Amino acid sequence: MAVLLVALCVFQTRSAQSSSATTSQAVPKPLLLEKNEGERRIWREPPPGDFILKVSPINNGSQHLVMGTEDITPGDEFPTHKHLGQDEIIYIEKGAVRVHLGDQERDLHAGGTVFIPAYTWVSVKNAGTEAVSVVFVFSAPGFENYMRCDSVLPNEKVTPLSPQEQKACGREGHVIYKDFEDNPKK
């Protein structure tokens, strides 16, 4: 967890130093959240699953970081994709995952960390028999827009997106899925 906190500080400092002057941004509000608190959302595509966005421009005005949590059921995965302009850290809280990162492949367990530089292909699969819990942190806002686009709130009806809508979500969230053109996500 110390690695995650250090990375958060580094990302925030680097983002603050490298960002150009912006006009009248909202001041981020501090948050204290329990494990299940935040913006809970349900993925549109099978297999069903949910995630919680905790820190984002919409949730608390954060201009430099996005953070959330997600559980991955056995056999499920984050398909091969890359983020355009955002680094990401995934911290494995519980369980075991198989990670393909660039030209590397490795199994990681609870306490493991994945650092994903922007523009690097990555996939993460639950390689075990129990649910995996992860914490994800992005160095800049953007991908949470994709996550919202491809999900619904718990009280909303889950409806699938067309391939064109999926592509639009990807553009909005600064992400490219490896097989997106021929084979939309999931």
Question: What are the language-model segments listed below?
Answer:
Residues 85-97, 102:
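Glycine- and acidic-residue-biased ligand/ion/polar-headgroup-sensing regions
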Residues 2-9:
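Bacterial N-terminal signal peptides
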Residues 103-119:
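Short acidic-glycine-tyrosine-enriched beta hairpin
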Residues 64-67, 87:
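Extracytoplasmic
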Residues 51-53, 68-83:
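Conserved short histidine dyad/triad with adjacent acidic residue
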Residues 61, 98, 118-145:
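Ligand-binding loop in jelly-roll beta-barrel domains
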Residues 11-65, 152-186:
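A short, N-terminal "cap"/entry segment at the start of jelly-roll beta-barrel domains
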